[in-house]
Amino acid sequence: MNYITAVITVRSGSQRVKNKNLKIFCDKNLLEYKIEVLKKVKKIDEIIVNTDSDEAIQISKNYNIGYKKREPYFASSECPNSEFWKNIAENTKSKFILFTHCTNPLIKKSTYEKFIEVFEKNKNNHDSFNSVTDVKEFLFLNKKPLNFDPSKSPNSQDLPNVIKLNFAINILTPSLMAKKKSLIGDNPFFYNLDAEEGYDINTKLDFEFAEYLFKKNRSQTEL
């Protein structure tokens, strides 16, 4: 059995940016970039693309990596994330899953390797490892402030250390993922990514800005 299997999920029915995982980003599509980075990462034993897209399957074959054809329901908007994650776990045979997305295209090879190093050092004390990003913003829920007192409004840099899951890199066992129907365990280790590497593409504007950042960084760093 493999020790760490990287799973990339690609569905053809993305809503806000049509077919974004296979959309040309600079000079390749997002899936191709992600595969090329992961193939260089030490300690990843296998890469599997879990998808309903025939084009993504063909790309997987071109790169000589594994793929799993996803059933239509699990690629639909009707399928909640909880069922989707359980299905991914049940269809991945490995001691650990490294779950990652094409839509975080700015993560470097070295960051994946550092994440795995942290996982190896702390795996006996935590059951999931999840990347996060700091949020230094004035937040409200139901018209009530969440992280500040409006009568004593601080400078933004002095706001509490709130973090958000960015779902860019996650490691856990398939059994825990299936049981919890989640990427988050009972005792997670949160690994902080800077805002740039944790940047996630959800909208057309996100796509265009990520492409700008990628082009800017390409001559300065290995991606």
Q: Which residues are covered by each model-predicted region?
A:
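Conserved SAM-binding loop
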Residues: K23-I24, V49, F99, Y199
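Residues at the starts of beta-strands that form the adenosine-phosphate
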Residues: Y3, D45-I47, D127
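A short, N-terminal amphipathic alpha-helix
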Residues: L30-I47
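Hydrophobic helical membrane-anchoring modules
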Residues: Y191-N192, E197-L223
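Short phosphate-binding loop-to-helix
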Residues: I48, D54-L98, L106, S110-K114
